[in-house]
UniProtKB/Swiss-Prot annotation:
Binding site for Zn(2+): 75, 263, 288
Identification of the protein by name: L-cysteine:1D-myo-inositol 2-amino-2-deoxy-alpha-D-glucopyranoside ligase
Pfam families cross-referenced by the UniProt entry: tRNA-synt_1e
Motif ('HIGH' region): 77-87
Segments traversing the membrane: none
PANTHER family: CYSTEINE--TRNA LIGASE, CYTOPLASMIC, CYSTEINYL-TRNA SYNTHETASE
Family to which the UniProt record says this protein belongs: Belongs to the class-I aminoacyl-tRNA synthetase family. MshC subfamily.
Length: 444
């Protein structure tokens, strides 16, 4: 097992005294969060090729080789300001993964969480004069509506952090028992932290040096200056109860989960110790995915939590990354209210490669709407050129690290030929329409 630190006898005894009482109280919670309605996905003849993806940890494109059931965990939203196009780009990326896997013959066990207990949520709720649960429920409902409108295949398990408290506590108990975690010497707020050096492989997922880690840790929710920590990089596992904050009972005192351990616990409980893919936006590479992986590896003894770490690029608007803190958000719900076809939103985001940081603009949307119109016009004709080659190319391009620009260009070429010259194959239009629906999630 990578974690070789041990708790003191006193720490172990204290945990044993409280463990069973608190677990009985908390385990009454069950997964109740519902996802969204699933779109109808056509089954295409034959099977698509094996998926290859860029792995952030290995820094190269390599085959994803799941068993009969492919497994994927994608970090979900913190439910406020949902759903902006940065969110949409991430979840559409992994919707493509889901669709390509299914097209190649795999069942897919996809898990997504909702971080419905976190500081930014509390801050926004306080600013708006609304309860944090009410805000979280409202924004989660909006997110689900947006995902359904965008025809995203829903996860099999859609789990709120507040539904997984018992699972988090169990993971924290194991980390404390192994010595990979510790309680800070603070009588008022005895928070529980994870030793960043608890696994020998820590840092493999991001590949960042310590200086970069410290800078990103401070920028992305970490607390390097917290007194009492063994190392500035040590990550919060359990935040001791504070005034005006929600809390749950635990063997180590009332409090609430840290961010990273929520995902580790939810993924391990529903999928297992090793995932085929852990995914999210590129801003999650560090610290979130580095630490959630380290937590899981320390508990399981596995060398690597995910066989592939896959990250989508950021979406910008008006010269800056789209973010809640900056306030430069383009919301899916607003585009929908403006009458924009969700298929055009998908095509606009697919016009760039998923790993690239890219900008959304009126020109991007206009091009996507024109493309959608051309494709619909072409597939509606009674006769068209044979579609066998274009469908094979789309399958091949998407299986090659989700190369949507090439896939879109292939369909553009077929549509242009169809509109310019026509054809005699009356099945070609429906064939292309089914392929675009099944693989790209766009209804023609």
């Amino acid at each position: 097992m990578p974690c070789d630190r041990k708790t003191s006898p006193d720490q172990h005894h204290a945990l044993q005294i409280h463990r069973h009482h608190h677990r009985r109280k908390i385990r009454a919670r069950v997964d109740a969060m519902q996802s969204w309605s699933a779109p109808s996905v056509p089954a295409l003849p034959g099977r698509g090729p094996q998926l290859r993806l860029f792995d952030s940890a290995d820094r190269q494109i390599r085959p994803v080789s799941p068993g009969a059931t492919a497994t994927m965990y994608v970090c979900g939203i913190t439910p406020y300001d949902a759903t902006h196009l940065g969110h949409a780009a991430t979840y559409l990326t992994f919707d493509l993964v889901n669709r390509v896997w299914r097209d190649s013959g795999h069942d897919v066990h996809y898990v997504q969480n909702i971080t419905d207990v976190d500081d930014p949520l509390f801050e926004r709720a306080a600013r708006d004069g609304i309860g944090w649960r009410e805000l979280g429920d409202r924004e989660t409902d909006l997110f689900r509506e947006d995902m359904a409108a965008l025809r995203v295949v829903p996860p099999r398990d859609y789990v709120a952090a507040t539904e997984a408290i018992a699972e988090v506590i169990e993971v924290v108990e194991k980390l404390l028992a192994s010595g990979a975690a510790y309680v800070v010497d603070d009588a008022q707020y005895p928070d529980v932290y994870f030793h960043a050096g608890a696994t020998v492989q820590f840092g493999y997922e991001s590949g960042y040096d310590r200086e970069t880690m410290l800078a990103l840790f401070a920028e992305r929710g970490g607390d390097p200056d917290r007194p009492g920590k063994s190392d500035p990089l040590d990550a919060l596992l359990w935040r001791a109860e504070r005034p005006e904050e929600p809390s749950w009972p635990s063997p180590f005192g009332p409090g609430r989960p840290g961010w990273h351990v929520e995902c580790a616990a939810i993924a391990m409980t529903r999928i297992g110790n090793v995932l085929d893919i852990q995914g999210g936006g590129s801003d999650l590479i560090f610290p979130h995915h580095e630490f959630s992986s380290a937590h899981a590896e320390c508990v399981s003894g596995e060398r690597r939590f995910a066989r592939h770490y896959v990250h989508a690029g950021m979406i910008g608007w008006d010269g800056h990354k789209m973010s809640k803190s900056r306030g430069n958000l383009v919301l899916v719900s607003q585009l929908r209210r403006d009458g924009v076809d969700p298929g055009a939103i998908r095509l606009g985001l697919f016009a760039g490669h998923y790993r690239q940081d890219r900008y959304w603009s009126p020109a991007v949307l206009d091009e996507a709407q024109q493309r959608l119109h051309r494709w619909r016009s072409a597939t509606a004709l009674d006769g068209a050129p044979d579609a066998t080659d274009v469908v094979a190319r789309v399958r091949r391009y998407l299986a090659d690290d989700l190369d949507t620009p090439k896939a879109l260009a292939a369909i553009d070429g077929w549509a242009e030929d169809t509109l310019s010259y026509g054809g005699h194959d009356r099945t070609a239009g429906p064939t292309v329409s089914a392929a675009v629906d099944a693989l790209l999630g766009v209804a023609l």
